[in-house]
């Protein structure tokens, strides 16, 4: 693995707000505050020590304001982009004598204010968008018409995700709620059920155990409020639709506030099943690797009982975590990436590259070696998921040491012996920034507190009627210096936090 910040003029020294890889080729599309969409060709450098290269290919210049989000359709034939002011453009790929060109196919105008996020349906026939006007809109991408308007949020809708199995749409807002809409067709039109999404669950608060056992559990908000310093809360479904990961999570233990992401099991979307704490800054984006991987160990070693491994990236305002469902701890931590907030993340279709965009006008590209993440798994053999039957054993999380977490039951349970259980996650891969390293870190002589694991008090988790005490061993995160910048900015080194996923009420 290698990677770092690619120092080229991405968007005329303007913030890069979004990016996405083409599902077939290694084209990378980026959108920024300069009103343009740019297409880049990503390639590996022959030298082992150099970063991947990004070569400019073309520009798409029909927006008149900042481009906040862009996503390729599953087939790669179309590209949808949303901008300030509420405009959405659907671009279509055309073959030309010079190679290829993207031309405007549809312009979708219905949102009254900025579009912050959007997502294609799995068949590429529909599109859902999220806006500052507090609503989501389901579009017929072929006709360019409004299919349905989803209302209910009381503040900006900053993230939206369409279930790959087509049954759910999830939206996340700065009103501190996540709404899960289920498709309940109302009738038939030309022998085809007309989709109709109805709000099935609204996630607002959850019960957190009080450290003082004499006091009852406290109900607290699950998500950050509108003071979160980001316009984006990009949530995501796993490629198989088995679970949903929500960013912008907030968990309060006594006086300590912990940033977290929530994992939702498809079997029970009314409450989070697992939380991923540990980030020093708020989590703003989640993106799943489109490739599923074969198990490296036995199935009983996995955190989720799935016949394959799912890998996903979680971006905070200043760092990147990569998780594997076969591992409790992150398999990769990349900190100190940028001088300003991270805005979006994207995987290439072959899992070769992971890209990150930032408001500091630059993008980071991480390249993985062949089979570094594992051997690809063919999902076509999983009949239950293909048919949408998710009430199977594959959806039940497995034991983590002496803990058994059942995310699908009405109440998550933790079974443990009366003695404390020591959970020691394997160390994650520590990413190195190839642009510049401080001398102490480069020589392995770092002496700052941030470079040493600190003692962590025993953490009590009370879920349902059973109690489990865990002594969690923190993982040291080595932080290397980012590229030298002439801009004044505060250090983005994250402090050490607990990063072991735990079950919650």
UniProtKB/Swiss-Prot annotation:
WD repeats: 11-50, 62-101, 110-149, 152-191, 223-268, 278-333, 337-378
InterPro entries: CAF1B_HIR1_beta-prop, Gprotein_B, PTHR15271, WD40/YVTN_repeat-like_dom_sf, WD40_repeat_dom_sf, WD40_rpt
Gene Ontology BP terms: DNA replication-dependent chromatin assembly; double-strand break repair via homologous recombination; heterochromatin formation; leaf development; meristem structural organization; nucleosome assembly; pollen development; trichome differentiation
Compartmental location: Nucleus
Pfam families per UniProt: Beta-prop_CAF1B_HIR1
Top-level taxon of origin: Eukaryota
CC annotations in GO: CAF-1 complex; nucleus
Keywords tagged on the record: Chromatin regulator, DNA damage, DNA recombination, DNA repair, Nucleus, Repeat, Transcription, Transcription regulation, WD repeat
Region Disordered: start-end pairs: 479-505
Principal cellular location given in the protein's record: nucleus
Keyword Amino-acid biosynthesis among record annotations: no
Keyword Lipid biosynthesis in record: no
Complexes and interactors: Component of the chromatin assembly factor 1 (CAF-1) complex, composed of FSM (FAS1), FAS2 and MSI1.
Function statement: Component of the chromatin assembly factor complex (CAF-1) involved in chromatin assembly following DNA replication and DNA repair. Required for several aspects of development, including apical meristem maintenance by regulating the durations of the S- and G2-phases of the cell cycle through its chromatin assembly activity.
Family affiliation: Belongs to the WD repeat HIR1 family.
Name recorded for this polypeptide: Chromatin assembly factor 1 subunit FAS2 homolog
Organism: Oryza sativa subsp. japonica
